[in-house]
């Protein structure tokens, strides 16, 4: 098979429908054992001064951190998939297995409390910061 240039590949992808592209991505992920999902959470690097300023104000954004899955890992994985949008089964399992991990970042207090309640009901240990 002749090697296709990046430009030729992009032209070929441009002709595909969204359904065909979705099927291609799934097949690519399976063949090469990779994932095209965006990272769930990325910790922001910040200095001490902004943290001190935030502490002086009333906190309006919260992070939900999965500390441990507990004994009911399958239930926790289901809840993680429910509260973290766009997460596949494998990604949710990897996230739960890799605890402690941040699940949600910079969400409203109500959303953080709701996620914490659901995760704790499933048997997980969760902190909200």
UniProtKB/Swiss-Prot annotation:
<keyword id="KW-0687">Ribonucleoprotein</keyword>
<dbReference type="InterPro" id="IPR008932">
    <property type="entry name" value="Ribosomal_bL12_oligo"/>
</dbReference>
<dbReference type="GO" id="GO:0006412">
    <property type="term" value="P:translation"/>
</dbReference>
<dbReference type="InterPro" id="IPR013823">
    <property type="entry name" value="Ribosomal_bL12_C"/>
</dbReference>
<dbReference type="InterPro" id="IPR000206">
    <property type="entry name" value="Ribosomal_bL12"/>
</dbReference>
<comment type="subunit">
    <text>Homodimer. Part of the ribosomal stalk of the 50S ribosomal subunit. Forms a multimeric L10(L12)X complex, where L10 forms an elongated spine to which 2 to 4 L12 dimers bind in a sequential fashion. Binds GTP-bound translation factors.</text>
</comment>
<dbReference type="Pfam" id="PF16320">
    <property type="entry name" value="Ribosomal_L12_N"/>
</dbReference>
<comment type="function">
    <text>Forms part of the ribosomal stalk which helps the ribosome interact with GTP-bound translation factors. Is thus essential for accurate translation.</text>
</comment>
<protein>
    <recommendedName>
        <fullName>Large ribosomal subunit protein bL12</fullName>
    </recommendedName>
</protein>
<comment type="similarity">
    <text>Belongs to the bacterial ribosomal protein bL12 family.</text>
</comment>
<dbReference type="GO" id="GO:0003735">
    <property type="term" value="F:structural constituent of ribosome"/>
</dbReference>
<dbReference type="GO" id="GO:0003729">
    <property type="term" value="F:mRNA binding"/>
</dbReference>
<keyword id="KW-0689">Ribosomal protein</keyword>
<dbReference type="InterPro" id="IPR014719">
    <property type="entry name" value="Ribosomal_bL12_C/ClpS-like"/>
</dbReference>
<dbReference type="GO" id="GO:0022625">
    <property type="term" value="C:cytosolic large ribosomal subunit"/>
</dbReference>
<dbReference type="Pfam" id="PF00542">
    <property type="entry name" value="Ribosomal_L12"/>
</dbReference>
<dbReference type="InterPro" id="IPR036235">
    <property type="entry name" value="Ribosomal_bL12_oligo_N_sf"/>
</dbReference>
């Amino acid at each position: 098979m002749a090697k296709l240039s990046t430009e030729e590949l992009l032209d070929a992808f441009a002709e595909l429908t969204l359904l065909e592209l979705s099927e291609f991505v799934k097949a690519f992920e399976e063949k090469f054992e990779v994932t095209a999902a965006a990272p769930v959470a990325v910790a922001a690097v910040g200095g001490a001064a902004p943290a001190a300023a935030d502490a002086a104000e009333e906190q309006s954004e919260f992070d939900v951190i999965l500390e441990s899955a507990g004994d009911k890992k399958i239930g926790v994985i289901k809840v993680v998939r429910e509260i973290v949008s766009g997460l596949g089964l494998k990604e949710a399992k990897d996230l739960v297995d890799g605890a402690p991990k941040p699940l949600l970042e910079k969400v409203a207090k109500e959303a953080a409390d709701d996620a914490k309640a659901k995760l704790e009901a499933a048997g997980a240990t969760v902190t909200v910061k």
